[in-house]
Design a protein with these regions (language model features):
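Short beta-strand segments enriched in small/hydrophobic residues
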Residues: 32-41
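Amphipathic, non-transmembrane alpha-helical secondary structure
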Residues: 12, 16-19, 79, 83, ...
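Phosphate/diphosphate ligand-binding glycine-rich loop within oxidoreductases
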Residues: 61-63, 67-140
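Glycine-rich phosphate/diphosphate-binding loop of Rossmann-like nucleotide-binding domains
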Residues: 40-54, 138-179
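Glycine-rich phosphate/diphosphate-binding loops that line cofactor/substrate pockets in enzymes
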Residues: 23-32, 84-89, 157-158
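Positively charged, low-complexity intrinsically disordered leader regions
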Residues: 1-29
Length: 179
């Protein structure tokens, strides 16, 4: 049996749900969710991707802050900005766009983000919970979470089935395997 998954229709549905949830948070609790997207360097694809994320968040009513740094930014400078964002009560989530310039250690940068604000779910605490199969409310990388959401929306149950995951990256393949 073949199931055609309409990603665009599902994205439209999820965007509408998200926009409504954000509006309710603002109306009932005076809360406006906030995300900071941090980018270092001038990688064209990364600039487009982060701009699109920033614009989408704004359309959904989310406070989005785009922090751009030159390619020669020092690790200390970027860590100082992450520390500010960690302590900023208007920012609920932090995303550091990869790839980073070569002088920056992605592991050090990722580990500096508070686990609760780690959009990509790459902080060791979040990864540990995921790989230990702990249930709870902690960040998991967006792509694997989105894949599982798509399957659930179309009532596709993988229990007892064989599935192939191509790739074993820490951002997609490994988290998807754990989900």
């Amino acid at each position: 049996m073949t199931t055609i998954i309409d990603g665009k229709a599902l994205a439209k549905k999820i965007n509408a749900q998200t926009k409504e949830l954000v509006a309710q948070l603002k109306e009932k609790q005076n809360i406006i969710p906030g995300i900071a997207v941090v980018i270092a360097g001038d990688d064209a694809a990364s600039l487009i991707y982060t701009r699109n994320k920033h614009n989408k968040a704004i359309k959904l009513g989310i406070n989005s802050v785009l922090k751009k740094f030159p390619a020669d930014v020092s690790q200390d400078e970027l860590l100082a900005e992450i520390e500010k964002l960690n302590n900023d009560d208007t920012i609920d989530a932090i995303l550091v766009q990869q790839p980073l310039p070569p002088q920056l250690d992605p592991e050090v940068i990722t580990n500096a983000i508070l686990p609760a604000k780690d959009v990509d779910g790459l902080n060791p605490l979040n990864l540990g919970k995921l790989f230990a199969n702990q249930h709870g409310n902690y960040p998991v990388a967006c792509t694997p979470r989105g894949i599982m959401r798509m399957l659930a929306e179309y009532n596709i149950d993988l229990q007892g089935k064989n599935a192939v995951i191509v790739g074993r990256s820490i951002l997609v393949g490994k988290p998807l395997l754990a989900l």
